């Protein structure tokens, strides 16, 4: 058994102990995050060479070891509250933190038997990082927590990064970082051959290479800790995960690579309390000088934001739902802009059944930002169809990296795109062909769905049932969006 697997099993065993108290996987991982950070800060303060006091002594790990019973719970709550007021990484990890372990005896057991017995600073970053990632993955499977919406399939992330090929010279950002999956994969790829890098390059990789924005406090803390455990950033410095709505404004900074899977959902909304005391949600159209369209559509706004923050000649790969390909109005305007001002060179049509959010039909758009020019920058768009006649589920038949091998081979990141060749699943469409389509529709298919024509080639019944559920769920999401748009902007009615 690998060291990472041993650590995962050990951490998971304590999660099962707390499950009876109503503590879910993600809540447990949050508590681990707080305690792990405190223990690692304690180890850093105790080391012989260049000791560093990250956490004030009155909030230190030692105060938890010394406390018992109700005093332990009180001290733990006090630490969480006070450290959440601090700037930098401390503030990101402990912002709005709460104790979810109500039994002091179980909290003590977690502190003494699990966390304190490990020398976390001496444990390799690959072991700590892999163990933490495994916990996050299991947390994504916890449907009740809703954490799956922040989790992009690792096989998809790895394939995207293998195509974009970030280097130590790049700066990478994810404006919807989730638990930092894209940032970690990009860092791992760029770190290959680090033994021959200069000290300046290694310092850049650790402190300036990756940056992320995340709206949700709990998810941001998981992302920040995930990066620290993988050796990215400085626990005593500024956080590489910024807790904010990335869409609010242009940050001013530009990055050479953008990798992102913006949250699914059709509209951005703003929660307010009406005069009668009930919550009212109003669609929020984002108005920015750098945006070409004003819309409340979340995906369109993220696409516009990414277009802004990407540096000239920068590369982007963005996971977006099907409606971005064909929706009229703002959608058509943005598709025209993509073809004209960017080199939109590749699209991967993802299969269904691979996301924890049910009913999602998504694609990956790969594009490069170009300087202003009179002619359109897109020459041809290469589309790889990994959806037609493909049947995946989260558990029985999960998507794995090898399922994307053919796509990466067709993408051929090491070659000029002029050397690409078409195949059964890989076709190219010229700018003239795309711009001539109704509403500049990118929703292009050419493969025949064999399951509709050959009854002997039907998927297994449980796969058919799962696809029906996903289609119905997707339809329900659309109907809910319509219903929300039709609701009057007034307070709710008491139940």
Positions of predicted regions on the chain:
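Conserved Class I SAM-dependent methyltransferase catalytic core
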Residues: 28, 160, 215-222, 292-367
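Short, contiguous acidic/charged loop-to-helix segments that flank catalytic cores in large enzymes
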Residues: 269-297, 322-330, 351-357, 372, ...
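Hydrophobic alpha-helix feature that most strongly marks membrane-spanning transmembrane helices
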Residues: 191, 228, 232, 263, ...
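Conserved S-adenosyl-L-methionine
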Residues: 146-260, 264-276, 285, 289, ...
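Non-catalytic, mostly N-terminal accessory regions of nucleic-acid modification and defense proteins
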Residues: 1-168, 231, 235-248, 349-353, ...
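Short hydrophobic/aromatic beta-strand or adjacent loop that forms the aromatic wall/cage
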Residues: 360-364, 381, 404
């Amino acid at each position: 058994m690998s060291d990472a697997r041993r650590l995962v099993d050990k951490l998971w065993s304590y999660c099962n102990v707390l499950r009876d108290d109503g503590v879910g996987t993600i809540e447990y991982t949050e508590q681990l995050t707080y305690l792990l950070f405190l223990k690692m800060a304690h180890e850093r303060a105790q080391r012989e060479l260049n000791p560093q006091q990250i956490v004030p002594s009155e909030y230190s790990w030692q105060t938890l070891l010394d406390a018992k019973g109700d005093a332990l719970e009180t001290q733990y709550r006090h630490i969480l509250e006070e450290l959440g007021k601090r700037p930098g990484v401390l503030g990101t990890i402990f912002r709005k933190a709460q104790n979810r372990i109500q039994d002091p005896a179980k909290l003590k057991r977690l502190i003494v038997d699990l966390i304190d017995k490990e020398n976390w600073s001496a444990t390799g970053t690959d072991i700590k990082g892999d163990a933490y990632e495994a916990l996050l993955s299991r947390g994504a499977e916890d449907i009740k927590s809703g954490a799956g919406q922040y989790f992009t399939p690792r096989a998809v992330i790895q394939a995207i990064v293998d195509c974009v090929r970030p280097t130590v010279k790049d700066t990478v950002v994810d404006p919807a970082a989730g638990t930092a999956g894209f940032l970690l994969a990009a860092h791992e790829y760029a770190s290959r051959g680090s033994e021959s890098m200069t000290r300046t390059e290694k310092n850049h990789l650790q402190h300036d290479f990756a940056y992320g924005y995340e709206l949700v406090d709990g998810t941001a803390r998981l992302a920040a800790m995930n990066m620290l455990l993988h050796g990215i950033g400085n626990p005593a410095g500024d956080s590489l995960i910024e807790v904010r709505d990335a869409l609010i404004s242009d940050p001013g900074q530009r990055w050479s690579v953008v990798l992102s899977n913006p949250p699914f959902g059709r509209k951005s909304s703003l929660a307010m309390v009406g005069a009668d005391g009930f919550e009212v949600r109003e669609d929020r159209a984002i108005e920015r000088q750098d945006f070409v369209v004003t819309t409340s559509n979340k995906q369109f706004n993220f696409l516009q934001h990414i277009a802004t923050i990407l540096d000239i000649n920068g590369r982007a790969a963005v996971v977006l739902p099907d409606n971005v390909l064909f929706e009229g109005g703002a959608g058509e305007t943005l598709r025209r802009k993509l073809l004209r001002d960017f080199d939109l060179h590749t699209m991967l049509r993802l299969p269904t059944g691979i996301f924890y959010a049910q009913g999602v039909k998504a694609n990956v758009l790969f594009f490069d930002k170009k300087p202003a020019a009179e002619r359109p920058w897109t020459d041809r768009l290469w589309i790889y169809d990994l959806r037609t006649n493909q049947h995946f589920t989260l558990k029985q038949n999960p998507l794995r990296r090898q399922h994307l091998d053919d796509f990466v081979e067709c993408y051929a990141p090491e070659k000029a795109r002029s050397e690409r060749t078409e195949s059964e699943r890989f076709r190219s469409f010229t700018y003239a062909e795309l711009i001539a389509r109704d509403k500049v529709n990118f929703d292009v298919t050419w493969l025949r769905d064999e399951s509709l024509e050959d009854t002997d080639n039907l998927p297994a019944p449980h796969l058919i049932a799962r696809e029906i559920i996903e289609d119905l769920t997707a339809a329900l999401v659309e109907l809910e969006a319509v219903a929300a748009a039709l609701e009057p902007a007034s307070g709710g009615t008491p139940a």
